[in-house]
Regions:
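Positively charged n-region of N-terminal signal peptides that target proteins for export
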Residues: 1-4
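Bacterial N-terminal signal peptides
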Residues: 9-25
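Cleavable N-terminal signal peptides
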Residues: 25, 30-31
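Primary mode marks residue(s) on the alpha4-beta5-alpha5 output face of response regulator receiver
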Residues: 32-80, 86-187
Length: 187
């Protein structure tokens, strides 16, 4: 009896596989996928374009193209970061940006000095460019971001494949803060 059940399961499995192989995948191609009806998704809205170099393993690299999205008005921002503006550029970093009042209240100074950076310092260093916006709007973006701290995750690749390694990249010009500077600047 058990052999009959096993044989029937195998037959049903092969029939199911044959049916799945016979069903066309509606000829889905990248071009057709782009033409599909658009619905709201988390991937929309990364349209603030910023250019800035980073320190990766202590070496200045980039400049990197940040495509940023405001997630909350206090502000909370996420940036997808690429080495170029090519349509198929590889995502090489992600930056989380939060209002100083949030980070300074929650992150211990030692951890902040190691992993976070102050955008006011980075912007004042003159290496950050807000692209694709008129000068008055670019200044507005820079002024808002100057009220925040950022943490950048860098992804490592072996050739074209990610290897699973990450590190915290740092802003060029990052300055560790003293306890009193940290407390005073988080208000």
């Amino acid at each position: 009896m058990q052999r009959i059940v096993t044989v029937l399961c195998l037959i049903l499995g092969f029939l199911l596989l044959a049916v799945l192989v016979a069903i066309p995948a509606h000829n889905v191609t990248p071009a057709l996928a782009q033409e599909a009806p658009k619905t709201a998704s988390p991937a929309e809205g990364y349209n603030i374009h910023v250019l800035a170099p980073h320190l990766v393993d202590g070496k200045q690299m980039g400049p990197y193209h940040h495509y940023c999205k405001v997630m909350a008005p206090d502000p909370q921002i996420v940036c997808l970061i690429y080495e170029s503006t090519e349509p198929n550029a590889v995502l090489s970093q992600v930056e989380w940006i939060y209002a100083k009042k949030m980070t300074r209240a929650a992150v211990p100074l030692k951890e902040w000095n190691k992993n976070w950076h102050d955008h006011a310092v980075e912007i004042a260093g003159g290496r950050v460019q807000v692209l694709d916006l008129p000068p008055d709007k670019a200044k507005e973006v820079a002024d808002t971001v100057a009220t925040t701290d950022g943490m950048i995750y860098h992804f490592y690749f072996d050739g074209k494949l990610p290897n699973g390694k990450t590190s915290i990249a740092q802003a060029v010009g990052h300055k560790p803060l003293t306890e009193s500077e940290y407390k005073a600047s988080g208000k």
